[in-house]
Design a protein with these regions (language model features):
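N-terminal glutamine amidotransferase
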Residues: 2-126
Length: 126
């Protein structure tokens, strides 16, 4: 004799929600390391990814000693298009981010990359 639980018809009809691994186009991220003019190349990379987010953009660079950050509302081409802005981002390492808002308000503090520069070291993430 075997025991088999009764099948619930509602459960049979209910579809399971399974994680869909399909790539979603939200935000754009670009990074580069050990390269001269890293912030300029990062701005170009973000420009190529502009379709991934238009709300805001930011770049964090690292010069081997300190992190430097510039974040702006709007398009990459309107914000990181001159030497005056890019000269504020020295270093051979940089990451950039185009914001496509999925959560949080439209504030500059929600524009990435985020970074922490401490006496013990630092980190930048996007």
């Amino acid at each position: 004799m075997s025991f088999q639980p009764k099948k619930n018809k509602k459960m049979q009809k209910k579809k399971l929600r399974i994680y869909n691994p399909k790539i979603k186009e939200e935000c754009g991220v670009f990074g580069i390391s050990n390269t001269k003019d890293a912030s300029t190349l990062t701005a170009l990379g973000l420009h190529a990814l502009q379709h991934r987010g238009q709300e805001g953009c930011g770049i964090v660079s690292f010069d081997g000693m300190k992190y430097h950050s510039e974040k702006r509302f709007g398009l990459v081409g309107d914000n990181f298009n001159n030497e005056e802005v890019l000269s504020k981002l020295p270093g051979n390492y940089a990451i950039g981010h185009n914001r496509y808002s999925t959560t949080g308000g439209t504030t500059l503090r929600n524009v990435q990359p985020f970074y922490a520069d401490t006496n013990a070291g630092g980190i930048a993430v996007s």
